[in-house]
Amino acid sequence: LVFVAGGIGLAPLRSLIWNVLDNREDYGKLDIVYGARSPADLVYKYDLDTWPTDDRFNMAGTLARGADKWQGTGGFVPHGPGEVAPSAQDAVAVVCGPPIMIRFTFPILDKLGFTPEQMITTLEKRMKCGIGKCGRCNIGNLYVCRDGPVFTYAQIKDFISKEY
C-alpha cells in the first residue's frame, strides 16, 4: 500500500492508515508520503513526529516551504512517491489532497509502474448538492456525489487533467 496525502488530505486517510497499522500482518509493504505548504499547514503533528520512527512502514515528508525542525525534505508532495520508490507489484496507491497535487501525482505513480486501476483517489471537493441534482460535480459521465467520491484513476484519467 502507498498512501499519498497533501495538506488536509491526511485527515480522510488517517483512519485507513491506523487500520492498516493495527492489522499489519494482513498487508505487505506500506509507504506513506505526506506534505503540506508550510509547517502551519501540517495536520496530526503527533503522528508525524512518531511515524518516521515506526519500523512497520516507510515515511516520506515534504514541505513546499522549509522549516527548521522539519524531518522531511523540501519540495512538493507529487515528488514524494519517487523518493520512496514503492513497488507497484500487488500494490495500491491511495491519493488524497488538493486537486493540483492529485493531478501531478498520477503520472509519477504511472512511471513507477502503477496501472490506472491501482491508483485510487477521492474527489469530494467537487461535490455541491450531494444528491446528483445540480450536476456541478460531474466529471465526464460520472457524478462524484452518486458514483464516488472514491474513484480509480482508470475511471477519471480522461477527464482529470481537463476538469479537475
Q: How would you describe each model-predicted region?
A:
Residues 42, 131, 155:
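Short acidic, gly/pro-rich beta-turn/loop elements at beta-sheet edges
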Residues 135, 140, 151-164:
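Short Fe-S-cluster ligation motifs
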Residues 100, 124-149:
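Local cysteine-cluster metal-coordination motifs and their immediate loop/turn environment
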Residues 34, 61-64, 140, 144-147, ...:
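Short histidine
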Residues 1-128:
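FNR/FR-type flavoprotein reductase catalytic core
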